[in-house]
Amino acid sequence: MQNRNTFSWVKEQMTRFISVSIMIYVITRTSIANAYPIFAQQGYENPREATGRIVCANCHLANKPVDIEVPQAVLPDTVFEAVVRIPYDKQLKQVLANGKKGSLNVGAVLILPEGFELAPPDRISPEMKEKMGNLAFQSYRPTKKNIIVIGPVPGQKYSEIVFPILSPDPATKKDVHFLKYPIYVGGNRGRGQIYPDGSKSNNTVYNATAAGVVSRILRKEKGGYEITIADASDGHQVVDIIPPGPELLVSEGESIKLDQPLTSNPNVGGFGQGDAEIVLQDPLRVQGLLFFLASVILAQIFLVLKKKQFEKVQLYEMNF
């Protein structure tokens, strides 16, 4: 009887341990997967400022190009592609958080007009799904379905990102009209230089916080440096901490100025933004245009036939 109770207790503890382990794994993976979009989502209600600047530029300081391609016009309740291209040299390597070199990742934010949103999976064609790859898009906010974010994803595979977009129908959404609308996009390649709290990452240049003489350079066991500067004004010691990644540019005994670079700038990535325009086209207007073109063509045909008939009558009268 005691053995049976012991077995039940062991079984219960193992079950509890496995359940807790699974929960920790899921939470950890979720936080890692969502780390990039959360940087902007937690800090800003809207990723596009009143000036037109996209807030990702606050952390990704280098300016790089980005391109967007959308149809000139779409019909209501239609799925279409918005293609975002984030070009960069695939041979480049970036500094990772641990100071080692690795491949660049990319990310993008697509700001659509109100009413436009990510297409549901059952509306996406197999051809479009093949172009999309294994990307997981998400809305910037549950209440802002027109703003879509993606990343970080491997740049080697996804420097061109296909967004599946569903256009709104003014018949069901009264605040949507048949007009020309702007679309804004921001895209980055590589890690940022500043974290949302204002602290520097190891993917940027580090400058001297005091003028003076470099009295000591200590290489840390896990990488990086502690640089001790004897202040030129009063001789007190200032210690600058350099994380693993950037290459050191100064040496012991060297005189340096305030804000002089102590390291190289390891950043090889950057952020860019662009825009495009799209027309939400009224089907009745399209039908009217087609009817007008058809009537013009028919009128031309009848005019040609009438002219030939008139020429035949003239020829007959001349012969008579």
Swiss-Prot record:
Residues passing through the membrane, by range: 286-306
Signal peptide: 1-35
Cofactor note: Binds 1 heme group covalently.
Residues reported in the UniProt entry to bind heme: Y36, C56, C59, H60
MF GO annotations: electron transfer activity; heme binding; iron ion binding
Membrane topology designation: Single-pass membrane protein
Function according to Swiss-Prot or TrEMBL: Component of the cytochrome b6-f complex, which mediates electron transfer between photosystem II (PSII) and photosystem I (PSI), cyclic electron flow around PSI, and state transitions.
Annotated protein name in UniProt: Cytochrome f
Species this chain originates from: Acorus calamus
Lineage: Eukaryota, Viridiplantae, Streptophyta, Embryophyta, Tracheophyta
